[in-house]
Amino acid sequence: MKETIQSATEGDQLLAILAALANPHRMRVVAALAVGGRNYVSQLARDIGISRPLLHLHLQKLEEAGLVTSKLELSQDGKALNYFDVTPFAFQITPAAVAEAAKTLTAKPET
């Protein structure tokens, strides 16, 4: 897999990425896709040992964060399969990068 570097300089984007990866199931999903390549939901759920509905929730969160992509395809027998693949990424999170990202947060601090 070719790695690309995405700059997570926007505060909201950085929060979405960190939140998406802060769950052990989602980390396992990214790992399975990174190692095994693109896969469809049913097979991926079996591979990592969680239910399809739960996997759908985690894939949605990962897709919203831009860490995975999906593509609906027809199988040989005419069934629609939703394939997921990991988006190549590399992030370097430094204190300076966090400070810059914090300047662009849209959420107001709680008082």
Placement of each model-derived feature along the sequence:
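Short, hydrophobic-biased segments on the C-terminal half of alpha helices
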Residues: 59-60
